[in-house]
């Protein structure tokens, strides 16, 4: 009986480790942007069956990208305090298991999304490959611009969601992509500010490590400013109304305000770095929620 209980506990841990490979919190955030794009493209709630299939396929694609990322980054994950307890550096899964899981999950995502339409499947796969081949295997360890260029992968879900409903890409989808693309650097640079010692130890050339805190804070402010007009552009596509417009402006101004507070903060204080990081998460959630609410009112 005790052996059976132990086996069940071990099986449960293995399942949790495979789920951890997908970085579920990140996947949920990406699914929110993809679902919001579907909602806006449909002018309201999209068909239930289409939504379920698209969300499953997109979740598989994002999870596969994250799993292969963990496989490739297992050496630096073992060095960083934030990541050393992940399944691979902790020795709970082997590299072969992680890679096999990522490849199979990625292939399944393509097959699932192919039942929606070819464009949707290709866009999700392009995002996966860009994240793995361009960001993870090239940019992350070689350039200070890693997160700027690599952010294109994380901005792909709105394109996937839009294509699932319409079978094409429109300017509204491109603007949603742009919002996530511009949001990504200040979000991750805020994290990098209070994790800079980790990144330096691992040899990852994040902006605070290479250029210093002051330069990073100015870049966060710059991208936060760019978010305001970029997010507002969606209003002029006619897909959302003034509720969204003013919400995006208020959220953008709050993001800028947090960035100014961050700029004024002096080391070793990191209160505003944590606040900016947390606010950026709220910003992305609320702005995509505003898109959905306003298109419902239209």
UniProtKB/Swiss-Prot annotation:
Family of the protein in this entry: Belongs to the UbiA prenyltransferase family. Protoheme IX farnesyltransferase subfamily.
Keywords for this protein: Cell membrane, Heme biosynthesis, Membrane, Transferase, Transmembrane, Transmembrane helix
Main location: membrane
HAMAP family in UniProt: CyoE_CtaB
GO CC annotation: plasma membrane
Note: Carbon 2 of the heme B porphyrin ring is defined according to the Fischer nomenclature.
Protein name (database record): Protoheme IX farnesyltransferase
GO terms assigned for molecular function: protoheme IX farnesyltransferase activity
């Amino acid at each position: 009986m005790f052996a059976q209980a132990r086996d069940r506990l071990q099986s449960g841990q293995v399942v949790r480790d495979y789920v951890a490979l997908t970085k579920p919190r990140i996947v949920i955030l990406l699914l929110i942007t993809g679902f919001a794009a579907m909602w806006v493209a449909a002018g309201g709630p999209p068909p239930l069956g289409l939504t379920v299939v698209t969300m499953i396929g997109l979740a598989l694609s994002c999870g596969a990208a994250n799993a292969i990322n963990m496989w490739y980054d297992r050496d630096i994950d073992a060095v960083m305090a934030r990541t050393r307890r992940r399944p691979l550096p902790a020795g709970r899964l082997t590299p072969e298991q992680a890679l096999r899981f990522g490849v199979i999950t990625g292939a399944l995502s393509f097959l699932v999304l192919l039942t929606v339409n070819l464009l949707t499947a290709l866009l999700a796969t392009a995002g996966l490959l860009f994240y793995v081949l361009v960001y993870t295997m090239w940019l992350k360890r070689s350039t200070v611009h890693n997160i700027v260029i690599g952010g294109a992968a994380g901005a792909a879900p709105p394109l996937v969601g839009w294509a699932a409903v319409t079978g094409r890409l429109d300017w509204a989808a491109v603007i949603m992509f742009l919002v996530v693309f511009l949001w990504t650097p200040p979000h991750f640079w805020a994290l990098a500010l209070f994790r800079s010692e980790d990144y330096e130890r691992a040899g990852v050339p994040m902006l605070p490590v290479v250029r210093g805190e002051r330069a990073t804070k100015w870049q966060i402010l710059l991208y936060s400013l760019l978010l305001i007009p970029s997010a507002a552009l969606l209003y002029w596509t006619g897909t959302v109304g003034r509720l969204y417009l003013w919400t995006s402006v208020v959220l953008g101004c709050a993001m800028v305000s947090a960035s100014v507070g961050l700029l004024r903060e002096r080391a070793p204080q990191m209160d505003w770095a944590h606040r900016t990081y947390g606010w950026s998460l709220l910003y992305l959630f609320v702005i995509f929620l505003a898109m959905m609410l306003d298109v419902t009112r239209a």
